[in-house]
Amino acid sequence: YFESLENQIGEKIILLNIADLLISISLIGCKPGSDYSSTNLKIENRNGAVSSTSRLASEAGVDIMKKGGNAFDAIVATGFALAVTSPSNGNIGGGGFMVARTNQGEVITLDFREKAPTLSYETMFLDDEGNYSRNLALLSHKSSGVPGTVDGLITILEDYGSGKFSLSEILSYAINFAENGHGINKSSAFGLDFYKHLFLEDKGSTKIFIKDYTLEMKQLQQDVLNGTIPEQEYIDKMRSLDQWNEGDIIIQKDWAETLKRISENGRDGFYSGKTANLIVNEMRANNGLISHEDLKQYRSIYREPILGNYRGYKVRSMGPPSSGGPLI
């Protein structure tokens, strides 16, 4: 729902360390090892642990394990819950990777990143004068890839889950957070205010993610449309209008209905039927490129892990198209 805060954080690492699995996702921005001092930090847990950017999402994963689930069950429950409670770090409109090692020693790397729509073309991010357009590349409907998260998480559950839980049981946490509301954390509150100007461009987003649509906001929108103020001044003034606070409740009934369709119909609840129609209609109305055929054809891909060495340790990571290769 809003752009990543990687530029401000510099490095973002999500680590899920459980008795029979180690999954880590490392994003670009890492500094050379020589820039860091060595720290010996040892954390032990006999039964497992879950770490994510959302306490609620992590608790969903922990609860699954307490009920007898394995680490992969916990990954899927946490992943879907993140789509509701921390959408800048996990969402069903995007994609991701999984790097995992089972207790049998098998190293798994699964690619479920977004894919370019069939209708993509070489000059789609160039403006009328033939110059690269940041807005077209980052903010337009043309920049949307075919989402892979739903297929990826379901693939993980099917191939490596314990078999003790149905998809509907795994999704029940995310559905509850969306339908009945959840308290947002400090990071989400900041993001909702920081990207207020983008949410205001869409009626659906405005309804949910703008806490109070004030006369001042309306006037600022009119001013930028009329050319009275430059765009950057408009953005800065919108960002200065703090509305959201840690602990504020967000309820997303439509989001819950989308998750229920996935819960009831699996992949077909997202890549076909009503949800697919909503996605394609949105694309058609706004010069987007994703088609029904793109959605139907999406499949996650198991890839060979890449191997590197660090201070005598063998490090296995995700290969292209991730940044795991350059990292190693």
Stretches found by the model and what they are:
Residues 5-18:
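Bacterial N-terminal signal peptides that target proteins for export
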Residues 28-29:
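C-terminal motif of bacterial Sec signal peptides marking the signal peptidase cleavage site
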Residues 1-2:
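Aromatic (phenylalanine/tyrosine) cluster motif
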Residues 32-59, 63, 71-265, 271-272, ...:
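Noncatalytic scaffold domains of N-terminal-nucleophile
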Residues 326-328:
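Small/polar-residue-rich segments within soluble enzyme cores
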